[in-house]
Amino acid sequence: MIDLDIFRENTEYYLPNLQCLGKVSICKRSKYMSLLLERLEIKHPIFLAPMAGVSTPELAAEVSNQGGLGSLGLGANTAETARSQILKTQALTEQPFQVNFFCHQSIELDPTIAQTWIDFLRPHFEQYDAEPPTQLHCIYPSFLDNDDFLNVVLETRPKAVSFHFGVPHPHQIQALKDAGILTMVSATNLAEARAIEAAGIDFIIAQGIEAGGHRGIFNEHFDSALRTVDLVQLLTQHCQCPIIAAGGIMNGTQAQQMLSLGASAVQLGTAFVQCKTSNANDAYRHALFHEHITQISASISGRPARGLLGHWHTQIDLPNRPAVAAYPYCYDLGKQLHAAATKQGDQGFGAFWAGTNVSQIRAMEAPDLINQLLVEMQQVSY
């Protein structure tokens, strides 16, 4: 019989093997895990990945109530809807959770590139008896653009806030620190991780190439494409703050491997998309269990993102494909094409984000999945 109560309250159960990790030993990493659990006030080193469009207050609360760190992906929200989502989550749980925003560099849309991209996709609109838009809009604001999102976070005071695509402005980081709100930023290579540390961020999320959804790369034109296992080892050896492993983690065995390499926690997204409390539609849920090939494409949104193989990969990402419009303008067009296709019963242009190990997905609700992960993690520990 596995005593989950003992397992949940003892960090050493997660890091049983003492081994050298180069510059930073596993002993020191064990202390980092203890620090992370203590500062976040959570029982387990298991995070729900913040997934814009899929995250819900209900799913976040379920994970947090089970001792992990729930999350809200708010990058696609306005300040008002972000506030509403946070308040709703706080009404469902008294436990800590994180909120996530995008920190991309906003750039001016190149009209020539945009028009070329619209024209390239025009035949695909026409096959669904639709016309593409004449203009593209910036549908996802950046946290860097103004302090509207910052003010919402300062008002609602979630336990932690994480960022994708870059680092917030210094004054924003300082305001969060002054409010006692912990900060996390995704890194895909050592240079990004060092920039994150230099900015005074509390935790680094090591996003491996296996991860579903958007790559957290700061520069959309450069990707080191490191596997999660390699990235975790690299960052734990060279960084002096807790590392959260993300990408391709679907079960407790994989989670425990990351912890044994020095990660202080693991973050899972794809594994939770199938939960009833996620916002995934029926087509997305069906695809998760039946379409197990994933591929990275920038055609959907304008930035590289990994998803289940669909029309974007087989019909759009061709050798003659022109340059895509800038993110998130490109995503405006992509969503409209998906909407047109859906009206005709075709879900092939959906952005069904998923990691490389999606074939290992299990039909489980969040509380049961957390418990199953813990059981599997302990079994590896002995």
Predicted regions and their residues:
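Conserved active-site-proximal phosphate/metal-binding subdomains
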Residues: 214-244, 249-382
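Cationic, amphipathic, low-complexity segments that mediate targeting or membrane/lipid association
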Residues: 5-12
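Active-site entrance/lid segments in N-terminal catalytic domains of soluble metabolic enzymes
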Residues: 31-238
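Low-complexity, intrinsically disordered or signal/transmembrane-proximal segments
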Residues: 13-14, 19
